[in-house]
C-alpha cells in the first residue's frame, strides 16, 4: 500500500510540474513576448497568402462583367452556378500557372493568345447582339449539356485566362507575383492565396446576391413592371456595350496588330554595312558559291522571356530545332568557318561539318512545312514594332537606336562565394546552353559536400598560396647568379596546337586559351596619307613602329559620335607583286588589319612598353595576302570604289558587348524637310514632332560657285526657311506613330493656351501653378511683418512704378494670349486660312485703290469749297508711300508683290508700312507739346497689320487700334479760338492777381532755399565722415549701395588703403535680427539718397523759376504767374512731406551711425590687436617647429596658420583697382573666407535652414579637412556626425581616385549651366585663387587675395530666401560651393582635381603633380589634365580614313606650354585676338613680388629664363584674366576646373577662333623639326559667320600672321639655341608664309569631296564643339525682328528709306546685326549670347596618359628633385621621331624605340596574364587575412606602417636598393600595378554587373589606387 501511495504521489507531482511548465510557457507566449508571437503569425506564409488573395478581390476586371451579367440576367440557379464555377476555375488556373511554369508559358504566349482572343471576342459580340445567331432562349431541359450553360461557363473561364498583354490586369492582382520572390514554401503560399481570393469572392457574391434580393423585394421597383421589364430587356445590350468598351480600352493599350503603322526599316545592304561597321562580333561567312547556293548567313537573335525579337533584319533561314524550340547557331557559341582547304580548321571542326548537312536539311524542311506561319505571325504580332511609347533617343551618327525596353535582368542560380545564389544578371544564353547540356550529359552528378562554403574558401586559399609560392620561387630563381635564362623564369603561354610536329597553332583570335588583347584587338591607322607613304616607301627606317594599344583601350567606352557621312573606309589594292617587292615594313603598318596574325608566325608576346618584333618579308607577305583574301571574300559585291579607284570597306571594331538595337532609324518632320533635297530623303517621317510649318522666306537664286570642284549650280536654288511652331501645347511629344499613347505619362493643362504641358508630378517645381497663382513672398511678408517692423515707413518710392510696370506687363500678356487664341483658331479650322487670306487681299486692294483715293478726293474737294488751297500733291505722295507688304503667318515680311509659299494653306498677313493718314490740313496749328507727342506716336506706329474687316492692328490678330479722327483737329482749333475770346475779357484781373502772387512766392522761396542748402551740406559732411571711418559703408552689409560722385569715390579709394582685411567682423549671432537690421539700413540709405536727389532737383527747379520770372511759356501769351502759383503748391507739399519723413527717420539713422562706429572702430582695434598677437605667437611657434622638427611636416602648424601673411601693399592695390573700375561687378572672392568664419556663420543659421546644409555638414570627408578647433566646436553642437579625431591622417595620397570618381558623376554641370540656374549677380562672379603663403613663394598678380569688401555683394538670404524651393536650391548650391572649396583639398597642396585654395607648409612640397630640380631649371613641364573639361575635349581614336592625323584640335591630354622669359600670355593672347591691352593692368607689380624659380607653383606654365636676366624684374602672368578691365569671362566651366593658362587661351580662341595645330599648341617637342612645305599648316584659320541664311555655313579659312607668330614662338622654344636673334626669326617667318584661301559653301552630298583643310575645320567644329546662341526672349525677339526686315530689304531695289525708318522706329536693331566683316565675338560672348562649349565625349585615353596620370596622383614625393624616371620618361617622349612627313597621333605615344630591360621590376610580369589576374582576385577574396591591402579599404583607419603593396616582395632584396636608378625605375614600375587593377575593375564592372555602357563605370565607388610610399 505504501508503494502504491508513493507512486501515486509521484504521478501527482509530475502532473503538477507539467501543469506549471505549461502555464510558464503560456505566460511566456502571452505575456512575455506577445509582439514576437504576433509578428510570427503575421509573417507566416498562410496569413500573407490569405491577405494577398483577399486583396485581389478588389481587382475589378472585365471578367466581372460576365459574372454580374449571369447573376442579373440569367434565370435559374444552374446558370449562376456555372458562371461562378467558371469564374473560380479560371482564377484557380491562373494561380496554378504561377507555380507551374509550362502552364504559365502557355498562357503567356503572345501569338496564341492573340489568335484566340480576337476571334472569341468577335464571336461573343455577335452572339449577344444577334438572337438569331444562336438560340439564346432558355430551355426547359435542366441538364448540364445545355449549350447556354456551357457558354456561360466558358465565358467566365476564358476571360480569367486572358493574358496581361491583351487585357492587362490591375496592380493588386500582381502583388501575388511580387511576394513569390520572398516566399520559400511557394505551394503553400499559392494555396493560401487562392483560399483568400475565394473567401473574398464569396463575400463579394453574397453582397451582390443581397443587392439583387433587395431589388426583387422592393415594392416600388416591383410595382413599376414596365420599368423592370425594360431594364431586363436592355441588360444584355448594356453588358455588350460595356464589354465592347472595356475591350477597346484594354486593346488600345496595345495597338491592334493589323491597323498599326509599319515603320520603314533599313534595307539589307545598309544593315549589313552598318552591322559590319558597328558589329561586336566577327563574322566569317562562306565563300560566294556556297552563299549563293544556300543563302545562309549568321543570325543574331535575342530570345526574351515572352517573345523572340530580331535585333537586325537578317534572313531567318538558318534555324536549328532543338527540343522543339528554334535556336540559332550563335546561341551555341560556335563560329561558322568554311576554310576547308586550310589544315588549321579541318580536324578541330570536323564534327561540326558532319552535322552541318543535317542542320541544313532540317532548316529547309522547316521552311517548307511552316512557310505560312512566319508571315502570319509577323503580320499579327510584329516584334519589331515600337509599341511602348518610349522616347526615340536620336543618334545622329551611324548607329541605330538602342532598345531600352528589353530588361537586362535574368534570374538564374550561380555559385557565388561558394554558395548557390540567385543572380539577376545571369546571361540568358548561358543558362539555356547549360540546360541543354544537362539534358544530354549529366555533368552535375557529383555529390555536394556538406561544408561547401568552407571547402570553397579553403580551395581559394590553396590556390592563392600556390600562386604566391610559384611567384616567389620564380623571383628567387632570378636572384641566383647561376646564369639561368630569363625565358625559363617567365611563365609560358599555353597555345592550342594542331600538330606537334609542325607546331602550327590556331589563330590567336580563335584560340580559347588566349584572352585579352589577342582575342579581338585591331590596330588602326587613321590617316590615309600616312598609310600611302608607308606602303609606297621602300626605306625600312621610315616605317612606323606601332605599339600595341593597352587593354584599357578595349575596356573604356568609345563613343561613335561622328556624323554618318564622315565614315568612309578606304583600302588600297594590293597584289602579290607589290607585297613581294616591298619587304621592309611591319605588318601593322596597314590600318584596316581586321584579323590577328596567322598561325605559322611565332610572335613573341608584347609587354606594355616593349617594341614589336618585325617579321621577315615572306611571312609578312603571307600575312597580308591572307588578310586581304579574307576581306575580299567578305565583300565581293558590296565594295564601293571612289575616285581614286580605292576600295571602301568597313573595318571590324574591337570586341565589346552587343546592345539590342532597333532595326530602323526614325526621322521627324524637320529632318524630313532638311533632307528632301538630298539623295537619301525619307518617304515619310515616323516621329510625331511638335506641330510646325516650314515657311520659306527667301530663295537664293544666285549662282553658287563651288570652290572645290569649280562647278556652278545655277539651277539649284537654296531656300531659307523659318520653322513656325504652333502656339499650342505639344501633345505629340515626339511619340512614334503606332505606339501606345495611353502608357505615356499623363499631362494636364490649366490655361487656355499653355506653351508646355506638364505632368502633375512636377507641379511643385513650377513657379505659379493653377491652384497657387499668388506669390509666396507676398504671403511671407504679411506673416513676418511684425518682425520687420512697419513696412510702410520703409516703402520705396519706386514701388508704384513697379506696380504700374507689372500691370502693363500683365495686360500685354493677356493681349498676347488673346492673339494666340485667335491665331490658333484660324489655323485649326479647315479652309479658314484660305477664306481669311482671300478676305485680306480683298481688303488690301479696296483700301489702297478705292477707299483711300475716294477720301483724298473728298477732302480736297471740301477744301476747295471752303476757299482753301487743295493738298493734292502731299496727299498723293503719302498715299503712294503706303506699302502693303505680304508677310507670312507669323509676320515675316516678304515683298509687295511676292506671296508666301502655300499661303492659302499656311496663312498670310498683310503689313502696311507708312499707313496713310487723312489730315484736314498739312501744317498743323497744334501746340508744341502736342506736336511732340504726335511725333513720338508717328515714330512708333508708322506700320500696322490689316485685319479681315479692313481695320488696322498694332500686331497680327491684335485688337483694332483707334484711328485718329479727321474732325478732331478742327474741333480743337474752334475751341481754342473760342477760349481766346473768353480770356481777353478776364485778362486785367489775372494780371493783378499774378503780381501779388509773384512777390509772395519770391519771399518764401528764398527762405526755403537757404534751409535746404544747409540740410544738404550737413548730410554731405556726415557721408564724408562715414566714408573716412569705413569705406565699407559704401556697400553696407552687402546690401547698401550708395551712389557717390566721382570725387567722393576717389576719397573712399584713398582712404581704403589703410583698411586691413581683418576688420570685417563676424556677423551677429541672431541671423534673423541681423538680416532685418540690414533691410532697415538698406531702405534707410535708399531713402536718404532719394531725398537728397529730390532736394537738389527742387533747388534747381526753384532757381530756374526765380531767375526767369517774366518769361512767358504759353503760345497764347499767358503770364507765367499762374503757372508758378500752380507749381508752388505741389513742390511745397512734396518737400514738406519728405523733410518730415527725414526728421522722423533721423533717429534710426543716428542709431545706425553709432552702431557702425562701434563695430568698425572698436572691433577693428580688437581684431588688429588679436591679429598681431596671433601672428607673433604663430611666428614664434614656426621658429620653434623649424628648429626642432626640420625634416617633418607639422600638420597642426599648417592648420592653425592664419592667412594674413600676404603683402598688404599688393593686396591694397588689387582692391583699389577693383573698386576704381566702374564697369566691373563686385566679385565674391569666396576663397578669402576663413574656415572659422564660414562654419561659425553656418552654425548660426536657424534650425529650419540646416536641413538644406545637410550635404555640407554630413559630408563624410568633412572631418578630414577641418581644423581641430572648428571640428570640435561644430561637433559639440550637432552640426557634424562627430567622430573621433584621427591623429595621423595620410597626406596627399588620401582617396584621390575615390574622390575623383565621386566628383565626376553624371550631374557634374558646367559653369554655363550653373550660370543659367543662379541669378545674374552670380554670372560674372570670379573664382579667384589664393597664393602660396611662403616668404619666397610665387605671388601671382591675379591671385592676390581681395578683401572681403567684395564679399558683401552676395545676395541676402534672410527672410527673402524662404520663398520657395528654387531659392533654397540656389542657396544650397552656394553653400556647397563654399564647403567644396574648403573641404575637397588636402593640406599638402593644390590638387589639380579640385581647383581649391592652397595651404603650403613651410617645407616646400610638391602639390601632387610635378617634380622639378632645385639646382637647374627643368627642361619642361608635363602637365596632366585629368579634370572635368577633359571629358569634353579629349582626343578620341578616329576610325575614318578620310581624316588625317594632323587634325588640329585641342588635345587636353598633353598640355605643355613653354614660354620664353618675357612672353606674357595675356599680351600674347591679346595680340592674337586684337583687343586692346590696358597698360594699367600691371601697375600693381612691385619689386618685392619676385618669382622663385627654385620653388614649385601649381600652375604649369614655366618661364625659360636666361641666366643673365635672373635679376631683372619679371612680368607676372595674368593667368585667368582676373583683371576687371577684361570684361569677358569664360562661358564654359574652365575658370573653376581647368588649368588657368589653358583657360585664357581658350577664352582667346572663343573670342576670335583660330585653329592651332596639335603640334604647336600642345606638343612642344624640344628638338628642331623641319616641316616639309607640303605638310606645313598654313595659317591661323579663322571663323567668319555670315548670317545670310540659317543653313549656310560661311567659313573662311584665311592665313593670318597670328598663327605664323605662334608657330615661330613655338619653334623658338623647340630650338636648342634659345637665344636666337629675333630679326632672323622674322625673316624666317616672312619666308615661310604661305597664304591659302578657300571657302566652304553650303552642305553638299555625301560623296562630294572637300579640300583637306575645309574638311578638317568643318569636322573639328562639328565634332568637338557646340556652337549655340543663347536665345533668350529679348534676343530672340530682336533677331526675329531683324530677320523680318531683312526679308523685305532683300527684295527691294531702293532700300535706303525702308532701312532707315526701320532703324529709327526700333524695328531693326543694330546691336544684333553682323556689321563688320571680320567679326570679333567679344561682345556676344561677354553678354553670354554666343556660347562655345566642348561637346561631351567619353574619352579613349592611351595607356601612357593613364600611367602618367596615375603616377602624378599615387606617388608622394617628399623631395623637390625631379626624378630620373620623369626625365627619362620625357626624354623618351622627345627622342621619338618615327617620321617627319606628317604629324601623327602616334608621335604622342610615350614609347621608346629602345629595348625595355626593366620589365621585370614588377614581379607579377613573370606570370602570364591569366594567372596574374587570378592571383589578384584571390588576394582580394582573402584580403582580410593577409597583409595586402584590399581595394575597397580606407587607409585613414589603418596604420601607415601596415600598408603594403606588391613591392613587399622586393623589399627584402638588397640588390634592388643598391642602384638608385634601378630603385627609381622600380618605383615607376610599381605604380603600373594600379593600371592593371583599373583594368580588372573595368572588367568586373562590365561583365560581372552586366552594364553595357561606360557611364556606370564611375558609379562603382571603389578606391582603386592605394597610396604608394617613397622610401
UniProtKB/Swiss-Prot annotation:
Its Gene Ontology cellular component terms are: chloroplast inner membrane
Q: Where is the composition biased (Basic and acidic residues)?
A: 1603-1615, 1623-1635
> Which keywords does UniProt give here?
Chloroplast, Membrane, Plastid, Plastid inner membrane, Protein transport, Transmembrane, Transmembrane helix, Transport
Q: Where is this region: Disordered?
A: 265-299, 798-817, 1599-1647
Intrachain disulfide bonds: none
Q: How does the protein associate with the membrane?
A: Multi-pass membrane protein
Record keyword Zinc present: no
Regions that span the bilayer: 41-61, 81-103, 108-128, 147-167, 195-215, 238-258
Subcellular localization is given as: Plastid, Chloroplast inner membrane
State what this protein does: Involved in protein precursor import into chloroplasts. May be part of an intermediate translocation complex acting as a protein-conducting channel at the inner envelope.
Predominant location of this chain?
Answer: plastid
Under Pfam families, the record lists: Ycf1
- Domain of life, per UniProt, equals Eukaryota
Q: GO biological process: any one? A: protein transport
According to the record's subunit comment, the protein's assembly and interactions are:
Part of the Tic complex.
Protein name, entry field: Protein TIC 214
Encoding gene per record: TIC214
As for family, the record states:
Belongs to the TIC214 family.
Task: Indicate, by first and last residue, each region the UniProt record lists as having compositional bias (Acidic residues).
Answer: 268-297
